[in-house]
Regions:
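Phosphate/dinucleotide-binding and metal-coordinating scaffold of catalytic cores
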Residues: 1-299
Length: 299
């Protein structure tokens, strides 16, 4: 159960049913016990990290706010609970929020060329508020990260497909696909990847299984790290992995990914680009994602 205090801080309590049969959705921040948890003001604007992971940021936040404006709603008037309700059942991982005020999600195969052009229009103009806004919102407006992206269904699987951002090279999709193949050759666990229409990078969603969802939490969400700042290093991730999984094989996954990021000069390896996934009644280091050479100070 979720509520807001008079200071606009998130209050959370596990239900009796979940206490009897569930697991901690965020072991360091929300251990599985009775009682009310109150969030800190920072770094998640009065929320808990595990719920902040479900909210759109970057591109997704841009799309949501313009979608709201297009429909006569001032985004500045929404509370944290309002925004979680807009995520509803469409967010990353297994968490769902009630009341569910999310828009109906389109999962059918998309016209990628048209969407890529609409993404360029949206990014090129602060005032663009055309139909492309609703199209992206209907196709999964909640994904995080800076690059335009959608969710789609193809070949019986759910995929995340990315488009080029303003500063990206024209072959960014081909580049990310090649690095995903290289990562797999290096023994790094990744979901299936492919190029749609020979230029749009797609990755199968690892938080979705047949007729179900898997719970996922980023390192930022787990330990309350501000991913916008260079606030953690790999030692923190090793410690989180050891504490959650108690499994040396999982720690080796972190090590391989650390070395790979260093060798490809990926400086976008911030706290939201690592995650843990709960499956088979245990925690595991999540498959890798966002593997590209990148500049930045927040890695």
């Amino acid at each position: 159960r979720l509520a807001l205090t008079k200071e606009s801080l998130c209050a959370f309590e596990y239900s009796t049913e979940w206490l009897n049969s569930g697991f901690s959705i965020s072991p360091f921040e929300l251990p599985l016990r009775s009682g009310v948890f109150i969030a800190k003001p920072r770094p998640f604007d009065g929320g808990f990290g595990v719920f902040d992971d479900c909210l759109p940021d970057g591109w997704g936040l841009l799309i949501l706010d313009r979608y709201l404006q297009r429909n006569g709603v001032n985004p500045q008037t929404l509370s944290l609970l309002d925004r979680l309700a807009l995520v509803g059942s469409t967010g990353r991982g297994a968490l769902e929020f009630r009341p569910d005020k999310s828009v109906v999600s389109k999962q059918e195969y998309a016209d990628f060329e048209k969407l890529a052009l609409e993404a360029e229009q949206i990014l090129d103009s602060d005032n663009y508020n055309g139909e492309g806004i609703e199209e992206f919102q209907y196709r999964g407006g909640s994904p995080g990260g800076a690059r335009p992206k959608i969710f789609t269904r193809y070949d019986g699987k759910e995929w995340l497909v990315k488009f080029r951002a303003k500063r990206d090279s024209k072959q960014i999709g081909e580049d990310e696909y090649c690095y995903s193949l290289l990562a797999k050759e290096c023994g790094i666990e990744m979901p299936e990847t492919r190029l749609f229409e020979d230029k749009y990078f797609g990755v199968e969603r690892f938080d979705r299984i047949l007729n179900g969802k898997l719970h996922v939490v980023s390192v930022a969400g787990l330990i309350g790290a501000d991913y916008r700042l260079p606030s953690i290093d790999y030692l923190h991730i090793f410690k989180v992995c050891a504490a959650l999984t108690h499994n040396v094989a999982e720690i080796w996954k972190v090590y391989r990914l650390m070395v790979f990021n260093y060798l490809i000069d990926n400086k976008d390896d911030h706290a939201k680009n690592f995650a843990f996934i709960y499956r088979d009644d245990d925690w595991h280091f999540a498959p890798a994602y966002d593997l590209l050479p990148s500049d930045g100070i927040n890695g």
